[in-house]
Regions:
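Class I S-adenosyl-L-methionine
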Residues: 1-205
Length: 205
Protein backbone atom coordinates (compact mmCIF):
# COMPACT_ATOMS: atom_id res chain seq x y z
CA UNK A 1 0.00 0.00 0.00
CA UNK A 2 1.67 3.18 -1.23
CA UNK A 3 -0.09 5.34 1.36
CA UNK A 4 1.31 3.28 4.24
CA UNK A 5 4.82 3.35 2.73
CA UNK A 6 4.66 7.14 2.30
CA UNK A 7 3.38 7.52 5.87
CA UNK A 8 6.48 5.70 7.10
CA UNK A 9 8.77 7.89 4.97
CA UNK A 10 7.18 11.33 5.43
CA UNK A 11 5.06 10.78 8.53
CA UNK A 12 1.24 10.46 8.59
CA UNK A 13 0.94 14.03 9.93
CA UNK A 14 2.40 15.30 6.62
CA UNK A 15 -0.31 13.68 4.48
CA UNK A 16 -2.32 16.36 2.66
CA UNK A 17 -4.64 14.69 0.16
CA UNK A 18 -5.32 11.83 -2.24
CA UNK A 19 -6.04 13.45 -5.61
CA UNK A 20 -8.06 11.30 -8.02
CA UNK A 21 -8.21 12.19 -11.69
CA UNK A 22 -9.63 10.54 -14.79
CA UNK A 23 -6.86 10.21 -17.35
CA UNK A 24 -9.17 9.19 -20.22
CA UNK A 25 -12.23 11.27 -21.13
CA UNK A 26 -13.08 9.98 -24.61
CA UNK A 27 -15.19 6.86 -25.03
CA UNK A 28 -13.28 3.70 -25.91
CA UNK A 29 -14.35 0.29 -27.15
CA UNK A 30 -11.04 -1.60 -27.04
CA UNK A 31 -10.95 -2.62 -23.40
CA UNK A 32 -10.15 -6.26 -22.64
CA UNK A 33 -11.45 -6.03 -19.11
CA UNK A 34 -12.39 -3.40 -16.56
CA UNK A 35 -10.41 -0.31 -17.58
CA UNK A 36 -8.32 1.55 -15.00
CA UNK A 37 -9.17 5.12 -15.97
CA UNK A 38 -8.63 6.71 -12.56
CA UNK A 39 -5.18 7.53 -11.25
CA UNK A 40 -4.26 8.74 -7.79
CA UNK A 41 -1.67 11.28 -6.67
CA UNK A 42 -0.70 11.20 -3.01
CA UNK A 43 0.29 14.63 -1.74
CA UNK A 44 2.58 15.04 1.27
CA UNK A 45 4.07 18.21 2.73
CA UNK A 46 7.55 18.76 4.13
CA UNK A 47 6.03 19.71 7.47
CA UNK A 48 2.80 18.85 9.25
CA UNK A 49 -0.17 21.25 9.43
CA UNK A 50 0.54 22.50 5.91
CA UNK A 51 -1.56 25.43 4.68
CA UNK A 52 -1.58 26.41 0.99
CA UNK A 53 -0.31 29.85 0.07
CA UNK A 54 -3.25 31.90 -1.08
CA UNK A 55 -3.12 34.24 -4.04
CA UNK A 56 -3.16 37.94 -3.28
CA UNK A 57 -6.33 39.76 -4.24
CA UNK A 58 -6.15 42.00 -7.27
CA UNK A 59 -7.93 45.26 -8.04
CA UNK A 60 -10.06 43.40 -10.60
CA UNK A 61 -11.30 41.01 -7.91
CA UNK A 62 -12.36 43.94 -5.73
CA UNK A 63 -14.22 45.87 -8.46
CA UNK A 64 -17.57 44.31 -7.61
CA UNK A 65 -17.46 45.47 -3.99
CA UNK A 66 -18.80 48.79 -2.76
CA UNK A 67 -20.79 50.29 0.11
CA UNK A 68 -23.94 51.75 -1.39
CA UNK A 69 -25.70 51.82 2.00
CA UNK A 70 -22.91 53.46 3.99
CA UNK A 71 -21.69 50.19 5.51
CA UNK A 72 -18.17 50.60 6.88
CA UNK A 73 -17.21 47.37 5.08
CA UNK A 74 -17.47 47.03 1.31
CA UNK A 75 -19.72 44.24 0.04
CA UNK A 76 -21.11 42.63 -3.10
CA UNK A 77 -24.58 41.27 -3.75
CA UNK A 78 -25.02 37.47 -3.77
CA UNK A 79 -27.99 35.13 -3.91
CA UNK A 80 -29.63 33.90 -0.72
CA UNK A 81 -30.70 30.57 -2.25
CA UNK A 82 -28.85 27.32 -2.88
CA UNK A 83 -29.53 24.16 -4.93
CA UNK A 84 -31.06 21.11 -3.30
CA UNK A 85 -34.71 21.88 -2.55
CA UNK A 86 -35.65 18.19 -2.81
CA UNK A 87 -33.14 17.21 -0.13
CA UNK A 88 -33.55 20.33 2.04
CA UNK A 89 -37.33 20.65 2.12
CA UNK A 90 -37.29 22.26 5.56
CA UNK A 91 -35.47 25.22 4.01
CA UNK A 92 -38.22 25.83 1.45
CA UNK A 93 -40.82 28.22 2.86
CA UNK A 94 -42.35 31.64 2.30
CA UNK A 95 -40.99 34.97 3.53
CA UNK A 96 -43.40 37.89 3.46
CA UNK A 97 -41.93 41.02 1.86
CA UNK A 98 -42.19 43.87 4.40
CA UNK A 99 -42.74 46.57 1.77
CA UNK A 100 -44.90 44.89 -0.89
CA UNK A 101 -46.52 42.17 1.23
CA UNK A 102 -45.62 39.60 -1.45
CA UNK A 103 -44.68 36.07 -0.45
CA UNK A 104 -41.10 35.34 -1.48
CA UNK A 105 -39.94 31.79 -2.19
CA UNK A 106 -36.63 30.33 -3.40
CA UNK A 107 -36.49 29.69 -7.18
CA UNK A 108 -37.64 26.29 -8.47
CA UNK A 109 -35.35 23.51 -7.30
CA UNK A 110 -33.59 25.72 -4.76
CA UNK A 111 -33.85 26.38 -1.03
CA UNK A 112 -32.88 29.26 1.24
CA UNK A 113 -29.17 29.35 2.09
CA UNK A 114 -29.78 29.97 5.80
CA UNK A 115 -31.77 27.92 8.27
CA UNK A 116 -35.14 29.32 9.28
CA UNK A 117 -33.97 30.53 12.71
CA UNK A 118 -31.19 32.60 11.12
CA UNK A 119 -33.48 33.89 8.37
CA UNK A 120 -36.02 34.97 10.99
CA UNK A 121 -33.31 36.78 12.93
CA UNK A 122 -32.20 38.61 9.78
CA UNK A 123 -35.74 39.59 8.79
CA UNK A 124 -36.44 40.94 12.27
CA UNK A 125 -33.89 43.65 11.52
CA UNK A 126 -36.40 45.14 9.07
CA UNK A 127 -39.51 44.87 11.23
CA UNK A 128 -41.11 42.33 13.56
CA UNK A 129 -41.71 38.86 12.11
CA UNK A 130 -43.14 35.60 13.40
CA UNK A 131 -43.41 31.97 12.28
CA UNK A 132 -46.85 31.03 11.01
CA UNK A 133 -48.54 28.22 9.07
CA UNK A 134 -50.05 29.57 5.83
CA UNK A 135 -51.07 26.34 4.06
CA UNK A 136 -48.78 26.68 1.04
CA UNK A 137 -48.16 22.95 0.63
CA UNK A 138 -48.72 22.90 -3.16
CA UNK A 139 -46.36 25.83 -3.75
CA UNK A 140 -43.59 24.16 -1.74
CA UNK A 141 -44.12 20.89 -3.61
CA UNK A 142 -43.73 22.79 -6.88
CA UNK A 143 -40.40 24.24 -5.75
CA UNK A 144 -39.15 20.88 -4.46
CA UNK A 145 -40.16 19.19 -7.73
CA UNK A 146 -42.27 16.54 -6.01
CA UNK A 147 -44.68 16.04 -3.12
CA UNK A 148 -42.63 13.16 -1.77
CA UNK A 149 -41.60 13.86 1.81
CA UNK A 150 -42.85 17.46 1.78
CA UNK A 151 -44.42 18.38 5.10
CA UNK A 152 -48.08 19.39 5.01
CA UNK A 153 -47.36 22.11 7.56
CA UNK A 154 -44.19 24.20 7.41
CA UNK A 155 -43.90 27.59 9.07
CA UNK A 156 -43.55 30.68 6.92
CA UNK A 157 -41.80 33.87 8.07
CA UNK A 158 -44.66 36.37 8.22
CA UNK A 159 -45.13 39.96 9.35
CA UNK A 160 -46.13 40.17 13.00
CA UNK A 161 -47.52 43.71 12.91
CA UNK A 162 -50.31 45.04 10.67
CA UNK A 163 -49.01 45.44 7.12
CA UNK A 164 -49.19 49.26 7.04
CA UNK A 165 -47.14 49.53 10.24
CA UNK A 166 -44.56 46.97 9.12
CA UNK A 167 -44.30 48.59 5.69
CA UNK A 168 -43.62 52.02 7.18
CA UNK A 169 -40.88 50.62 9.42
CA UNK A 170 -39.24 48.70 6.58
CA UNK A 171 -39.37 51.70 4.22
CA UNK A 172 -37.75 53.87 6.87
CA UNK A 173 -35.06 51.22 7.36
CA UNK A 174 -34.43 51.07 3.62
CA UNK A 175 -34.24 54.85 3.25
CA UNK A 176 -31.71 55.03 6.08
CA UNK A 177 -29.42 52.91 3.90
CA UNK A 178 -30.05 55.08 0.83
CA UNK A 179 -29.08 58.16 2.85
CA UNK A 180 -26.14 56.23 4.33
CA UNK A 181 -27.37 57.00 7.82
CA UNK A 182 -27.61 53.34 8.82
CA UNK A 183 -26.47 50.33 6.76
CA UNK A 184 -29.00 47.78 5.59
CA UNK A 185 -29.15 44.42 7.38
CA UNK A 186 -27.25 41.40 6.03
CA UNK A 187 -30.30 40.50 3.92
CA UNK A 188 -31.63 43.37 1.84
CA UNK A 189 -34.14 44.03 -0.94
CA UNK A 190 -33.37 45.05 -4.52
CA UNK A 191 -35.31 47.35 -6.89
CA UNK A 192 -35.58 50.33 -4.53
CA UNK A 193 -36.61 48.07 -1.69
CA UNK A 194 -39.48 46.44 -3.59
CA UNK A 195 -37.58 43.62 -5.30
CA UNK A 196 -36.21 40.25 -4.34
CA UNK A 197 -34.12 39.28 -1.36
CA UNK A 198 -30.32 39.30 -1.63
CA UNK A 199 -27.39 38.87 0.76
CA UNK A 200 -24.42 41.13 1.43
CA UNK A 201 -21.08 39.34 0.92
CA UNK A 202 -18.34 41.31 2.62
CA UNK A 203 -14.94 41.80 1.01
CA UNK A 204 -13.03 40.49 4.02
CA UNK A 205 -15.10 37.30 4.15
Amino acid sequence: NLKEICDEIFGPNCFVSNISWQRTYSKRNDSKGIPAEIEHILVFSKRGQWIPKRLQRTATMDEGYSSQDGDEHEWSSVTISAPGAATHQGMVYAIQHPITGELLYPPLGRCWSFGQAQMLECMNEWTDYELRIINDYEKRCEICGSDRGVSKETNAIMLKKPFETAQAEALNRYNQGIKKERPWPLLYFTAKGKGGLRRKQYLNK
